[in-house]
Design a protein with these regions (language model features):
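Transmembrane-helix signature of 12-pass secondary carriers
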Residues: 1-463
Length: 463
């Protein structure tokens, strides 16, 4: 076991052992440390997804309390997404330059601060500005969740453990709707309007999580690309010692064939050779998936009020439908490392395309809840598969930037989505909204089938 836990950097053919960090991490058996890391990172996903789906809840609540019109309701949903667009572009690129851990702390700190201020917003203008700023803080959260976990987790469980993190994260979606329904029904708590408590809860939870994340190590893969091999060695050796103590035996040997050192690469590398094909495929994917995936979650409460239900009823029905998000995420866990990611993405997207129009045409309460639930189940099998898949498309030196820039396109689409979708909803009704969404999901399937590479079960450095 001395070959894996020695504190003295081993050299192999003149190359420090830091260049073998990726292969050493990949061959580790999953441990309590890996599970704890997944838990801490997954809680961050909870607050990101809570915030994303909170926009639809706030739009439904404030439309009634502040008598908002069509444009104002759309703006409440869009403001956070616009902030996420800017944040994803800026913070994800900074994460490739300054490190994953540092940006983890910056983004949660910014979100907690501005979300707390948002709870005190006196009018719509202040609310929109502060929603934008809180979204700016969260812009790169899911990008960093994917990147950080992928760079630490052993390849044999990479997909499954990222799915665990998102299963925890997606509990935030029904929580946002259920809290909204309860707090709206209560009208005020300690003299403060219920919807403001939704923002306070997110801010305080994120602030607590930021304190927990201060103990996280930097990604050894990122350190290795930066030429900081000694630091990478210390982190990997410490992890090896921890896992060896837990398992009580020798660690698996490092496969020599998998020692593929990575290097710093310029951002322009995204548009050269094989990376260009993957970049184009993923940009198209992110624009299309936003409509089919976030379209339902962010618009469902507003769509249900358009069907004639009260705000409280709409939030309750949405919350019941949203229970499919964590359940769908849990369902993906046994599938994600057994079925090729690309195939699973396409199958789940077809499920979304089928359930969306059924929800749009539904009038009976049981049908609304049933098809909404099935849609969210399919959505999170889809979501977990693509979050794992995108970490496997790009090399370490580009991973955060490439994923973040593509993700920012989805946030930009999300800015326009409520204005377009609510106009279609007003003029043509819910069925037209979800039929159009289904058509875009079918285009997404073609994009992934034609341009997406296979990735399941391979080392990040070998895809």
């Amino acid at each position: 076991m001395t070959d894996t836990t020695s504190s003295t950097p081993e050299r192999r053919g003149g190359t420090p052992i830091g260049a073998r960090a990726a292969a050493r991490l990949d061959r580790l058996p999953p441990s309590r440390w890996h599970r704890g890391l997944t838990l801490i990172v997954g809680i961050g996903a909870f607050f990101d997804l809570y915030e994303i789906f909170l926009g639809g809840v706030l739009a439904a609540v404030l439309a009634d309390q502040w008598h908002l019109g069509h444009t104002a309701k759309s703006s409440v949903i869009a403001a956070g997404f616009l902030g996420m667009f800017v944040g994803a572009n800026v913070l994800s690129v900074l994460a490739d330059r300054f490190g994953r851990r540092r940006m983890f702390l910056v983004n949660l700190g910014g979100y907690a601060f501005f979300s707390l201020l948002c709870a005190a917003a006196p009018d719509l203008s202040w609310l929109l500005v502060l929603r934008f700023l809180s979204g700016l803080g969260l812009g790169a959260e899911l990008v960093l969740v994917d990147t950080y976990l992928a760079e630490f987790l052993p390849r044999a469980v990479r997909g499954r453990y990222i799915a665990y993190a998102y299963t925890l994260g997606f509990v935030g979606v029904p929580v946002a709707a259920l809290l909204g329904a309860r707090l709206v029904a209560a009208h005020a708590l300690f003299g403060i309007e219920g919807w403001r408590w939704l923002l306070v809860a997110g801010a305080l939870g994120a602030a607590f999580l930021q304190l927990m994340r201060r103990r996280l190590p930097e990604s050894p893969r990122w350190l290795m690309v930066q030429g900081r091999d000694a630091e990478a060695e210390r982190i990997v050796a410490g992890l090896e010692e921890r896992v060896a103590r837990e398992t009580g035996g020798s660690l698996p040997s490092v496969p020599e064939a998998e020692t593929v050192p990575e290097r710093k690469v310029p951002l322009a590398e995204m548009f050269r050779g094989e990376q260009r094909r993957r970049t184009v495929m993923w940009w198209i994917f992110q624009v299309l998936q936003t409509v089919g995936y976030y379209g339902f979650g962010s618009l469902a409460p507003v769509v249900l009020t358009a069907k004639g239900h009260t705000v409280t009823e709409s939030l309750l029905y949405a919350a019941l439908s949203f229970c499919g998000y964590p359940l769908g995420s849990a369902l993906s866990i046994p599938l994600i490392d057994r079925i090729e990611r690309r195939t699973l993405i396409i199958a789940a997207a077809l499920g979304i395309a089928g359930c969306g129009p059924a929800f749009g045409f539904a009038t009976a309460t049981w049908a609304i809840v049933t098809f909404g639930f099935l849609l969210t189940v399919c959505s999170n099998v889809f979501s977990n598969a693509f979050h794992v898949y995108q970490t496997e498309l790009f090399p370490t030196g580009l991973r955060s930037s490439a994923i973040g820039i593509a993700y920012s396109l989805s946030r930009l689409t999300s800015v326009a989505l409520p204005f377009i979708a609510l106009s279609v909803l007003t003029d043509l009704g819910p069925a037209a909204v979800f039929t159009g969404s289904a058509a875009l999901m079918l285009l997404l399937c073609v994009d992934v089938a034609l341009l997406g590479p296979r990735s399941t079960g391979r080392s990040l450095e070998r895809i």
